């Protein structure tokens, strides 16, 4: 489940590529963990839309956004843990 207000806890935007970082928590165990969604914005006539498919030239940017998301998550984690705990 995504966080209560359905907004990412952090976003990384590089050009049209966006990596959204979500904090999830188990209702049963209370365990917390981060997940990441990656999307690309594009314009279709007068509307902006998002897609999760990427063109060849998007891939280096996607790679960098994921690398930055990983670093941000790592900074949030307590020493000695691989995931966040509230």
Regions found by a protein language model. Name each.
Residues 1-86:
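Single-stranded nucleic acid-binding surfaces, predominantly the OB-fold ssDNA-binding core
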């Amino acid at each position: 489940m995504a966080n209560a207000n359905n907004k990412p806890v952090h976003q990384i935007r590089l050009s049209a590529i966006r990596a959204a970082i979500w904090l999830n928590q188990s209702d049963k165990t209370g365990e917390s963990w981060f997940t990441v969604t990656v999307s690309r914005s594009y314009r279709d006539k007068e509307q902006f839309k998002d897609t999760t498919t990427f063109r060849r030239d998007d891939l280096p940017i996607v790679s960098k956004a994921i690398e930055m998301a990983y670093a941000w998550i790592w900074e949030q984690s307590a020493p000695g843990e691989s995931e966040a705990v509230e």
